[in-house]
């Protein structure tokens, strides 16, 4: 099983990176939080890998930290959550927000992640509530991005993972949209990032 992959970034997209090592290119599925921290094309990256094997598929899922990989593995232990949905969940909510929402039983916040229905959210709370560590650095009562679309939430999550404060990040996303930025992730993310700098 592949557990660690170090190589050069050949291509990168919000949920996918192509890493070349030893003359071989590996397509690795990643959450937005990993995408935002990748080096420029040609830069070296080191990813913690979860190898998913089925009879017809061998898929690699990559994370920059062991903690994020461990959270991913906890998510896929929940009945009804596979690797693809787990990556969407990690892209839809920052890790600290996700842990806090599960520990508090905030089903209504979890169902805002694309692909997560009420039953899945309830199973996440039931099966993981006591297995997750307390989230650190979380402001109690921080405003949630309830009015944002799934793409907006991806951009917000990416900004939070870069260390932006939630109020400024959310305001930047709204301003970027109001200024006519494209509704696609990358242009919206670039414009919002300019606004928070």
UniProtKB/Swiss-Prot annotation:
Molecular functions (GO terms): ATP binding; four-way junction DNA binding; four-way junction helicase activity
Gene Ontology cellular-component terms listed: cytoplasm; Holliday junction helicase complex; Holliday junction resolvase complex
UniProt region (Domain III), positions on chain: 153-197
InterPro entries: DNA_helicase_Holl-junc_RuvA_I, Hlx-hairpin-Hlx_DNA-bd_motif, NA-bd_OB-fold, RuvA, RuvA_2-like, RuvA_C, RuvA_C_sf
Region (Flexible linker): 144-153
Subcellular location(s) of the protein: Cytoplasm
SMART domains xref list: HhH1 (SM00278)
Alphabetical UniProt keywords: Cytoplasm, DNA damage, DNA recombination, DNA repair, DNA-binding
GO biological processes: DNA recombination; DNA repair
Gene3D superfamilies given in the database record: 5' to 3' exonuclease, C-terminal subdomain, DNA helicase RuvA subunit, C-terminal domain, Nucleic acid-binding proteins
Protein function: The RuvA-RuvB-RuvC complex processes Holliday junction (HJ) DNA during genetic recombination and DNA repair, while the RuvA-RuvB complex plays an important role in the rescue of blocked DNA replication forks via replication fork reversal (RFR). RuvA specifically binds to HJ cruciform DNA, conferring on it an open structure. The RuvB hexamer acts as an ATP-dependent pump, pulling dsDNA into and through the RuvAB complex. HJ branch migration allows RuvC to scan DNA until it finds its consensus sequence, where it cleaves and resolves the cruciform DNA.
Alphabetized HAMAP family for the sequence: DNA_HJ_migration_RuvA
Domains (record comment): Has three domains with a flexible linker between the domains II and III and assumes an 'L' shape. Domain III is highly mobile and contacts RuvB.
The name this protein goes by in its record: Holliday junction branch migration complex subunit RuvA
Originating species: Solibacter usitatus (strain Ellin6076)
């Amino acid at each position: 099983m592949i557990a660690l992959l170090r190589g050069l970034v050949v291509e990168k997209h919000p949920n996918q990176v192509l890493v070349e090592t030893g003359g071989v290119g590996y397509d690795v599925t990643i959450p937005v939080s990993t995408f935002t921290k990748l080096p420029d094309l040609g830069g070296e990256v080191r990813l913690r890998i979860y190898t998913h094997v089925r009879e017809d598929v061998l898929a690699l899922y990559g994370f920059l930290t062991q903690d994020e990989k461990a959270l991913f593995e906890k998510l896929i232990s929940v009945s009804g959550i596979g690797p693809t949905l787990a990556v969407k969940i990690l892209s839809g909510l920052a890790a600290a927000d996700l842990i806090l929402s599960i520990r508090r039983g905030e089903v209504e916040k979890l169902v805002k992640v694309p692909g997560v229905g009420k039953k899945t959210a309830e199973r996440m709370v039931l099966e993981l509530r006591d297995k997750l560590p307390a989230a650190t650095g979380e402001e109690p009562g921080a405003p949630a991005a309830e009015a944002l679309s799934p793409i907006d939430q991806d951009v917000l999550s990416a900004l939070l993972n870069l260390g932006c404060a939630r109020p400024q990040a959310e305001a930047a996303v709204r301003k970027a949209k109001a200024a006519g930025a494209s509704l696609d992730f990358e242009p919206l993310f670039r414009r919002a990032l300019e606004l928070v700098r």
